[in-house]
């Protein structure tokens, strides 16, 4: 061990231990191991008690609270997912019903328009048939009138031709028969 020597001022000088070596680092001194181990054991027991009685319950309660919050959030998410699935099913059902209604309305409108256009077409066909019959009657009457005028014109022309060529006035009855025969042949 080191010995101290006092000087005139009362200061103590430290000298090297026997053998001229310095004193070893105190934790590594063999004669203090037992007290150091007891101090270390007391420190670890105190640390263990503090950690196990104060810190670990707080950490455990925080972890339990966090796990409970996660469980609650997961349950809420599952509930909301179920609600959204139900809402989606209801939406899809409503959408399918709306499509069916739209198709039914479209089909009904199409049928109604087809029926209206068919009725209009039939009405127009009937009106056209009536107008066609009237036109045919008018044409027949006009033709009859024209043919009666043609007969007179043809008889006058034939009489003029016969008189011009032969210089004789033709007999009216013979001329009428010849014109009638010629007109009947052209109509056939």
From Swiss-Prot:
Q: Which Gene3D superfamilies match?
A: 6.10.250.1580
Q: Quick check: keyword Membrane in the entry?
A: yes
Locate the compositionally biased regions of type Low complexity: 8-18
How this chain sits in the membrane, per its record, is: Single-pass membrane protein
Tell me the superkingdom of the source.
Bacteria
Main subcellular location: membrane
Q: Where in the cell is the protein located?
A: Cell inner membrane
Give positions of region: Disordered: 1-23
Q: Which Pfam families match?
A: ATP-synt_B
Function per UniProt: F(1)F(0) ATP synthase produces ATP from ADP in the presence of a proton or sodium gradient. F-type ATPases consist of two structural domains, F(1) containing the extramembraneous catalytic core and F(0) containing the membrane proton channel, linked together by a central stalk and a peripheral stalk. During catalysis, ATP synthesis in the catalytic domain of F(1) is coupled via a rotary mechanism of the central stalk subunits to proton translocation.
Its assembly, as annotated, is: F-type ATPases have 2 components, F(1) - the catalytic core - and F(0) - the membrane proton channel. F(1) has five subunits: alpha(3), beta(3), gamma(1), delta(1), epsilon(1). F(0) has three main subunits: a(1), b(2) and c(10-14). The alpha and beta chains form an alternating ring which encloses part of the gamma chain. F(1) is attached to F(0) by a central stalk formed by the gamma and epsilon chains, while a peripheral stalk is formed by the delta and b chains.
Q: What is this protein called?
A: ATP synthase subunit b 2
Look up and give the organism this protein is from. Answer: Rhodopseudomonas palustris (strain BisB18)
């Amino acid at each position: 061990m080191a010995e101290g020597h006092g000087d005139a001022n009362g200061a103590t000088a430290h000298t090297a231990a026997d053998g001229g070596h310095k004193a070893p680092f105190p934790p590594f001194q063999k004669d203090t191991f037992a007290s150091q181990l007891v101090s270390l054991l007391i420190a670890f027991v105190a640390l263990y008690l503090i950690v196990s009685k104060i810190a670990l319950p707080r950490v455990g309660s925080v972890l339990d609270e966090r796990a409970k919050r996660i469980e609650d959030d997961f349950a809420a998410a599952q509930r909301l997912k179920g609600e959204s699935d139900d809402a989606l099913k209801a939406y899809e059902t409503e959408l399918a019903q709306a499509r069916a209604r739209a198709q039914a309305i479209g089909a009904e409108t199409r049928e109604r328009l087809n029926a209206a256009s068919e009725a209009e077409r039939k009405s127009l066909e009937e009106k056209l048939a009536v107008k066609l019959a009237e036109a045919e009657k008018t044409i027949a009457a006009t033709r009859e009138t024209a043919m009666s005028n043609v007969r007179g014109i043809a008889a006058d022309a034939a009489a003029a031709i016969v008189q011009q060529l032969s210089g004789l006035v033709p007999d009216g009855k013979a001329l009428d028969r010849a014109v009638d025969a010629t007109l009947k042949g052209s109509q056939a």
